[in-house]
């Protein structure tokens, strides 16, 4: 059964901004990529490094792992370059009553 996790008010996540939220034992990063709100696990599948500390390309909607440079698609969690080759989990995002929420299961 899914649940919604509150991230922040929508006004606090303008284009290019990033927030992280903890759910159970997982960190989830939420990014406003040109007006599109995207969420995925904040963990590189190559070495468990925090992706939220990497560089985000808002034009391509990607994040670069700060440790070894793997690029991940923010929409799907899919790695686009090596050394990572396993996707990280992505999550639906919605705005309800002005609050950004991530849907988790």
Indicate residue ranges for each PLM-predicted region.
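Short amphipathic
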Residues: 2-10
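Solvent-exposed, conformationally flexible loop/turn segments
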Residues: 13-16
